[in-house]
């Protein structure tokens, strides 16, 4: 397996990405990594024992860039890393750069699988009992129709079954209530369609209060609502953790409680730490594209490389292509 990794344009030092790539290759002898970025800066960080290929990129997409302005940045590290996958010189791509630009360029360069109306941005979130849940879409599309939501359910179900090895994954649509008449017209229409799809384990609407309670394995939403829900969860977790840590500033009993709670606090922190399960797939593309956090460190790059490896190994793209070819055959 060959992966192209964009090591530029994110908020951390490039050594975080390079060190993660080095250690990942040591533990995965069947993986080769192409580092894409400023050759001079990369060479300062690599060791003589490293077996990396370097593709020089003279440009860098900044976090402040917008998708329209980067069309002509064909010499940027992000563009070149994605292009390597299109040219079949790599099996998948990973970047921690500007999210909106990355999603735009993957659409532009790699294209969609025939039959798929919209691609979606899908992360993984840990849940109470450790099973976890995927969330599609969380920002690639501000607006969706019923067909898009149905396709998200189909793609996400296949991904969870083939990559996460969850049999017969449960699927739900994020909504303001569980009754069939709740939500906007496209929610109601998608709900009706999915109830009749035999190869999807659809359980109906899911309210946001149950996102982390393992009622489903896949939450389906348009990207606008999905992004708000995801960021609300992230913010809530940080606030609760900060509040718990704040008890140590209180009198003796506060300190005593804090000291006794340290093991439990660490367990909770490790369980819900997104760094352990970093990386989101742009699902629906002709190739594998993974995006990690803009402030990614060693841990996040490493876990994102693991996701990239597992997705490529599962032969996900060919499975999705075969699934959506059936739609064309039926027309």
Swiss-Prot record:
Keywords: Cytoplasm, Lipid biosynthesis, Lipid metabolism, Phospholipid biosynthesis, Phospholipid metabolism, Transferase. Signal peptide: none annotated. GO terms for cellular component: cytoplasm. Disulfide bonds: none annotated. The keyword Lipid metabolism applies. It comes from the Bacteria. It catalyses: a fatty acyl-[ACP] + phosphate = an acyl phosphate + holo-[ACP]. GO terms for molecular function: phosphate:acyl-[acyl carrier protein] acyltransferase activity. Homodimer. Probably interacts with PlsY. Belongs to the PlsX family. Catalyzes the reversible formation of acyl-phosphate (acyl-PO(4)) from acyl-[acyl-carrier-protein] (acyl-ACP). This enzyme utilizes acyl-ACP as fatty acyl donor, but not acyl-CoA. This is Phosphate acyltransferase. The lineage of its organism: Bacteria, Bacillati, Mycoplasmatota, Mycoplasmoidales, Mycoplasmoidaceae. The gene is plsX.
């Amino acid at each position: 397996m060959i992966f192209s990794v964009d090591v530029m344009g994110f908020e951390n030092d490039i050594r975080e990405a390079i060190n993660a790539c080095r250690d990942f290759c040591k533990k995965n002898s069947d993986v080769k990594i192409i580092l894409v970025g400023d050759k001079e800066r990369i060479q300062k960080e690599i060791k003589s024992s490293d077996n990396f290929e370097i593709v020089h990129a003279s440009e860098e997409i900044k976090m402040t860039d917008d998708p329209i302005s980067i069309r002509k940045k064909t010499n940027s590290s992000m563009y070149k890393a994605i292009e390597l996958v299109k040219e079949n010189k790599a099996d998948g791509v990973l970047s921690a750069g500007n999210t909106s630009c990355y999603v735009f360029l993957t659409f532009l360069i790699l294209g969609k699988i025939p039959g798929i109306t919209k691609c979606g941005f899908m992360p993984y979130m840990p849940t109470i009992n450790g099973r976890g849940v995927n969330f599609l879409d969380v920002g690639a599309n501000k607006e969706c129709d019923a067909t898009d939501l149905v396709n998200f359910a189909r793609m996400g179900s296949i991904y969870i079954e083939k990559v996460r090895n969850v049999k017969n994954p449960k699927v739900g649509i994020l909504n303001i209530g569980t009754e069939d008449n709740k939500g906007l017209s496209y929610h109601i229409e998608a709900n009706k369609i999915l109830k009749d799809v035999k190869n999807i384990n659809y359980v109906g609407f899911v309210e946001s209060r149950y996102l982390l309670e393992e009622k489903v394995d896949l939450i389906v939403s348009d990207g606008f609502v999905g992004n708000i829900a995801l960021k609300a969860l992230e913010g809530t977790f940080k606030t609760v953790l900060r509040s718990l840590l704040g008890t140590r500033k209180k009198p003796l009993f506060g300190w005593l409680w804090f000291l006794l709670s340290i093991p439990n606090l660490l367990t909770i922190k490790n369980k819900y730490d997104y760094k352990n399960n970093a990386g989101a797939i742009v699902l629906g593309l002709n190739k594998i594209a993974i995006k990690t956090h803009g402030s990614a460190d060693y841990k996040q790059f490493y876990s994102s490389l693991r996701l990239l490896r597992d997705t490529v190994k599962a032969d996900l793209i060919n499975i999705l292509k075969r699934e959506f070819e059936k739609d064309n055959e039926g027309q």
